[in-house]
Each structure stands twice: as C-alpha cells, then as structure tokens.
Amino acid sequence: MNKIAIFGANGRMGRVLIEAIDQSQNATLNAAFVRASSSMMGVDVGELAGIGQRGLTVTDANSADFSQIDIVIDFTLPEALEANLALCVQQKKPVVIGTTGLNQQQKDALQRASQHIPIVFAANYSIGVNLLLNLARQTARVMGGTADIEIIEGHHRFKKDAPSGTAVAIGEVIADELGRDLSTCAVYGREGDTGERDQQTIGFATVRAGDIVGEHTALFADIGERIELTHKASSRLTFANGAVKAAVWLKNKSPGLYDMQDVLGLA
C-alpha cells in the first residue's frame, strides 16, 4: 500500500484528497499537514473532509515522522511551495504538486528540487484534461497554420489566479506545436478598438462565477468551419483521483520533473 501525506489538508483540494485517498484501493493516508498556527491542528482528517472520523489527526509537517510516508501531495499556495519542496528534498520524498499560479522563482525552485527527488507537476490532474491537451496538440498540427485559436476557461468565484494554469498549459502545447512563444503571442482579454485579429496570436478569455468546478475550451476557428475541444469537470474528485494516481505512479521513480502526460503514457 502506498502511504501518502497531504500538504494543505484544510484547503478545498486538501479535503477532497482526503476523501479520494480514503476511497482508493492503492493508497492510504498516513499524514495530513496544515500550518502550525492553523485552528485545524489536531482535528480528525475524516471530520475535516466530512466523511466521519478516521483515527488520524491533522498535524504540522515540521514535526511529522516522514519514515511512515512514501509520497507527498501538495495543493497549497505558491508562497508555500519553496518551503514544502525543501522539506521533501530534506526527507527524500517524492512529491506531486498541483499548485498553480507559480512565478519564475518558484518554477526555478521546482527545477532545482527535481534534481534530487522525483516530482510530478501538472496544472490539472484530470485524465480528461490531459487527453484534451493531447488532442489540442494534434489539432494545432493540422489546423494551426490557418485557424484562429482561442482558449476559454471558467472557474468558481473563489479562484485567485487567471487565466487558469490549465488554460495556460493548453496554450503552451499549442504554441509549442506551432513553433511560437506563448509569452509573446498570447492575448489576454480584449476591450475597445482592438483592430483586426492577428492570426499568429492565441487568445485567452476567463470566466469567474458561482461554483464552476472547471471548464476549458480550445477553439480552432477557420473560414467555414471550426473545432471546439471542451472539457467540463463536475467534481473536484476528478482532480483528486488523478493526483492519487500520479502519486502511486511516482513512487520509486528516479529524480526528475514529470507531468500527467508521463503518468498516463501520453508523452
């Protein structure tokens, strides 16, 4: 059985991860971490996730016994990433990271840590989204030379970053396939007199409303026809189950930086 620990157990994804691991046939939850100052310290993980007591209490990572942990899953905030990575490197534990909205310094820290431990880092752990990424690359290969490309994403009102990490990941695979640099060809939102559309650009549009779990569309529009690749998530368990799958896959892997395309054999 694969023994998993969670960073950010009291967050929205942390609570769903507790439920996903509880339902898993291949993994068990051995530790759940929150900040030492959190009011959730000492709470039973099952109560935290709303699934009834499980006999494991929430604790602080710095005082934990990592000898009983095989893999760590981190869905916290960007500002917590570097400290969490340092602890995983110190303890020599593989880590699955789902934190999005990273700046360049945090991405560099991820690269450095991957020289010492195996890491899976993905903007989205849904199997369907990763199939969408694969299909977007194929569509860009065939239609990208002439089609206008737009990426539309929607999430709940509480999401703090925009566009979503998944939307950016879709843009990156399309830009890579077309030999473009997303940092120079991306257009984020439009307003006022924008002039005619530059066919070399990749447009992004963002919706933040209600309790939308996650919706992404890659639109390839040519004259006379268009293709829309859409994924809609109806439950966060979709992402949590994918992260648990990645954690099980990551155990005993060599140091390096992997993604869900590797986990699913799509790379």
UniProtKB/Swiss-Prot annotation:
NAD(+) binds at residues 8-13, 98-100, 122-125. The active site is at residues 155, 159. InterPro entries: DapB_C, DapB_N, DapB_N_CS, DHDPR_bac, NAD(P)-bd_dom_sf. The keyword Transport does not apply. Belongs to the DapB family. Transmembrane segments: none annotated. The lineage of its organism: Bacteria, Pseudomonadati, Pseudomonadota, Gammaproteobacteria, Alteromonadales. Its EC number is 1.17.1.8. One of its GO terms (biological process) is lysine biosynthetic process via diaminopimelate. This is 4-hydroxy-tetrahydrodipicolinate reductase. Keywords: Amino-acid biosynthesis, Cytoplasm, Diaminopimelate biosynthesis, Lysine biosynthesis, NAD, NADP, Oxidoreductase. (S)-2,3,4,5-tetrahydrodipicolinate binds at residues 156, 165-166. It comes from the Bacteria. CDD domains: DHDPR_N.
